[in-house]
């Protein structure tokens, strides 16, 4: 059960990290 909590925290941290980068640096290449 502990592993699930760790994975959740890790995913949240990664998500916040990418979110901060996206807001700090707008994507130069606007291609999907």
Curated annotation (Swiss-Prot):
Localization recorded for this chain is: Cellular thylakoid membrane
- What is the predominant subcellular site recorded for this chain? membrane
Please report the record's description of how this protein sits within the membrane.
Answer: Single-pass membrane protein
**InterPro entries associated with the record:** PSII_PsbT (IPR001743), PSII_PsbT_sf (IPR037268)
Q: Does the keyword Kinase apply?
A: no
**Which Pfam families does the UniProt entry name for this protein?**
PsbT
Transmembrane region(s): 3-23
A GO cellular component annotation in the UniProt record: photosystem II reaction center
* Any one GO BP annotation for this protein: photosynthesis
How does the annotation summarize its subunit structure? Answer: PSII is composed of 1 copy each of membrane proteins PsbA, PsbB, PsbC, PsbD, PsbE, PsbF, PsbH, PsbI, PsbJ, PsbK, PsbL, PsbM, PsbT, PsbX, PsbY, PsbZ, Psb30/Ycf12, peripheral proteins PsbO, CyanoQ (PsbQ), PsbU, PsbV and a large number of cofactors. It forms dimeric complexes.
Q: What does this protein do?
A: Found at the monomer-monomer interface of the photosystem II (PS II) dimer, plays a role in assembly and dimerization of PSII. PSII is a light-driven water plastoquinone oxidoreductase, using light energy to abstract electrons from H(2)O, generating a proton gradient subsequently used for ATP formation.
Under which name does UniProt file this protein?
Answer: Photosystem II reaction center protein T
- Species for this entry: Cyanothece sp. (strain PCC 7425 / ATCC 29141)
């Amino acid at each position: 059960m502990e592993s699930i909590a760790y994975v959740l925290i890790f995913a949240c941290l990664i998500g916040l990290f990418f979110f901060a980068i996206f807001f700090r640096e707008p994507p130069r290449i606007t291609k999907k």
